[in-house]
């Protein structure tokens, strides 16, 4: 299992917010977008902040998760721990120290 750890600088949107360290779990089909890492360790106050971080640090991963308007793609699900973000506060879901964000793309076939 490959894990990438980073220290994140805050941008204008997160400067006044309390940031915490969380883990983002990257599914196998998207690991090539982040150097093969299965997990990313990052600091962000919200799910939106975590997505902004991947936009800066792993743009191809971001483009796989979000569309050109910044919305999460329809076939991608984001969970914080065991709760889907849509069942919480969407992208504004606050993160707590040690939370795990899981990227889960839909699987289809026939």
Where are these regions (language model features)?
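Ubiquitin-like/PB1-type beta-grasp interaction modules and other compact soluble beta-rich domains
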Residues: 2-109
């Amino acid at each position: 299992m490959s894990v990438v750890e980073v220290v994140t600088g805050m941008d204008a949107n997160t400067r006044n917010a309390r940031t915490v360290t969380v883990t983002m779990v990257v599914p196998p089909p998207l690991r090539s977008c982040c150097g093969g890492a299965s997990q990313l360790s990052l600091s962000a106050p919200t799910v939106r902040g975590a997505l902004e971080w991947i936009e800066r640090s792993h743009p191809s991963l971001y483009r796989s998760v979000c569309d050109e308007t910044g919305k999460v793609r329809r076939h991608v699900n984001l969970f914080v721990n065991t709760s889907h973000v849509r069942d919480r506060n969407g992208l504004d879901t606050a993160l707590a120290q040690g939370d795990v964000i899981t990227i889960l793309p839909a699987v289809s076939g026939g």
